[in-house]
């Protein structure tokens, strides 16, 4: 997150839950293969989305802008049992990456 001072960002990341392996791999692949990787939600934003989702326990989530799927995977961590996430994106070229990681995340 580039909009926070580095010391605050470092502190928040240090005291946040670690990325699971699927998210680490997705993060790495996005930065290695995608043209504008900074659009990825990333570790701190992902943990924040996960926390909100776990607090609310939504039955349904609509995400507009899938990108490579990082934020969608984080949001799913708090879904109610049998809940559903609907995510849409205009860029079909990224669907292969997001679909692969959605399957890995289960």
Segment roles from a protein language model:
Residues 1-106:
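A short alpha-helical cap/connector motif
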């Amino acid at each position: 997150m580039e909009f926070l001072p580095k010391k605050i960002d470092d502190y928040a990341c240090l005291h946040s839950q670690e990325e699971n392996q699927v998210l680490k791999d997705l993060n790495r692949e996005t930065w290695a293969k995608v043209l504008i990787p900074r659009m990825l939600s990333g570790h701190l934003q992902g943990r924040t989305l996960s926390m909100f989702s776990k607090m609310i326990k939504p039955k349904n989530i609509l995400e507009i802008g899938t990108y490579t799927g990082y934020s969608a995977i984080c949001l799913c961590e708090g879904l109610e049992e049998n809940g559903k996430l609907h995510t849409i994106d205009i860029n079909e070229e990224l669907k292969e990456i997001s679909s692969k990681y959605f399957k890995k995340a289960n």
